[in-house]
């Protein structure tokens, strides 16, 4: 006759704490496992993914209207004409890093209106 799961639970619940510790130790030896490892594996994926709060705005390409894109880059970054032109011509390049989502989306919109291809990461 086989012992049921309920019978095992009843037997364990009637045991003292020391008896349960000895039972666990004996089971670890018998089956070659560790109860601590099982707990660590089960507790591993508890961390929730944090929502990203800082974004990078990347200029992928200047597009057909390079002059308008250079003006938009100057206005957004405060760079001089030569620096903005060099940045636009070296696309793909990071325009701004670590900005808020709203600022990144606003910058992306203004650059796309000027004709640039922009990515927010």
Curated annotation (Swiss-Prot):
Keywords carried by this UniProt record: Ribonucleoprotein, Ribosomal protein
Gene this protein is translated from: rplL
GO MF term list: mRNA binding; structural constituent of ribosome
PANTHER family: 39S RIBOSOMAL PROTEIN L12, LARGE RIBOSOMAL SUBUNIT PROTEIN BL12M
Function: Forms part of the ribosomal stalk which helps the ribosome interact with GTP-bound translation factors. Is thus essential for accurate translation.
Top-rank taxon, per record: Bacteria
GO biological process, one term: translation
InterPro entries reported for this sequence: Ribosomal_bL12 (IPR000206), Ribosomal_bL12_C (IPR013823), Ribosomal_bL12_C/ClpS-like (IPR014719), Ribosomal_bL12_oligo (IPR008932), Ribosomal_bL12_oligo_N_sf (IPR036235)
Family to which this protein belongs: Belongs to the bacterial ribosomal protein bL12 family.
UniProt subunit comment: Homodimer. Part of the ribosomal stalk of the 50S ribosomal subunit. Forms a multimeric L10(L12)X complex, where L10 forms an elongated spine to which 2 to 4 L12 dimers bind in a sequential fashion. Binds GTP-bound translation factors.
Cited Pfam families: Ribosomal_L12 (PF00542), Ribosomal_L12_N (PF16320)
Family annotation (NCBIfam families): L12 (TIGR00855)
Protein's name according to its UniProt entry: Large ribosomal subunit protein bL12
Record flagged with keyword Acyltransferase: no
A GO CC term attached to the entry: cytosolic large ribosomal subunit
Disulfide bridges in this chain: none
């Amino acid at each position: 006759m086989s012992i049921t799961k309920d019978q095992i639970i009843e037997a364990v619940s009637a045991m003292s704490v020391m008896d349960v510790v000895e039972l666990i130790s004996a089971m670890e030896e018998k089956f070659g496992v560790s109860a601590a490892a099982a707990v660590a594996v089960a507790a591993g994926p508890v961390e929730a993914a944090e929502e990203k709060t800082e974004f990078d705005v990347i200029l992928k390409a200047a597009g057909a209207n390079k002059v308008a894109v250079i003006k938009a880059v100057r206005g957004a970054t405060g760079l001089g004409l030569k620096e903005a032109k060099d940045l636009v011509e070296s696309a793909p390049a990071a325009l701004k890093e670590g900005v808020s989502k709203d600022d990144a989306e606003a910058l992306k919109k203004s650059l796309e209106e000027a004709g640039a291809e922009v990515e927010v990461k």
